Amino acid sequence: MKIDLIKPAVEGTERVVSLALKQNVRKIVLTSSVAAISSGHTKKQFSEEDWSKVDEPIPAYPKSKALAEKKAWDLINKSNKKTKLTVINPAGVIGPSLTSEVSSTQLIISGLVNGKIPINLPIHIGYVDVRDVALAHVKALESTKSDGERIILSNTELWTKDVSKILRENGYNAPRFSASVGVAKFLSNFIPILKPSRRFFGKAMTKNSTKAEDILGIKYIDISKSIIDEVESLKRFGKFSG
């Protein structure tokens, strides 16, 4: 599984960046993830200075993101070309979708409204609207201020109970009761959708995303709108019928 994720991520990034350098592309804006920043650490606050600990036994996804991004920076830094690089590191991306594919972040929200997650989990996640992510890429491409920068995109961090509260306030059925870490781990043995989230139970981490505002001028879409637009997309693609 690790090879399936890591090798394509690193080699794909290497091919694209190498070709861009060969063609003397003026600037590259690379989509990475906060997963390249925070995995494998015990601390709770992160900035663009941090990197996931790829030498530790971390999951394949954050390892692939960190190694792919490191490869891009390595190629740029060793090149004698004038090509500039900006890396965008989004938190959990939500909002309106163009396809029926569901990400791990979206899976939590869909589980809360379709009943597959019957109780609020002790999960604390950073969220950002897909429209803000798209805008950040455009602004990064146009701005020389972003040259050579990693930029975290995270509107806010919410516990699952906070997401459920927003859903209920907007007329959706969502859990009212919250599970402790112990109960959540126990339930994850019987509810498959919970297993991928086990490593996040009870961990509250925050990311400093001031660069997005200071360098790119990003003004985040209201998080409630992002969540509701996400749910409307899930409904449109038949992920639930509520």
What is each of the regions a protein language model found here?
Residues A136-K195, I223, I227-G242:
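Mid/C-terminal beta-alpha module of Rossmann-like enzyme folds, strongest
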Residues K2-Y61:
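Conserved Rossmann-fold NAD(P)-dependent oxidoreductase catalytic core, especially the SDR/UDP-sugar
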Residues K81-T83, G95-I108, A140-I151:
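Glycine/proline-rich active-site loop of Rossmann-fold NAD(P)-dependent oxidoreductases
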Residues S188-K219:
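Conserved C-terminal active-site "lid" loop/helix of NAD(P)H-dependent oxidoreductases
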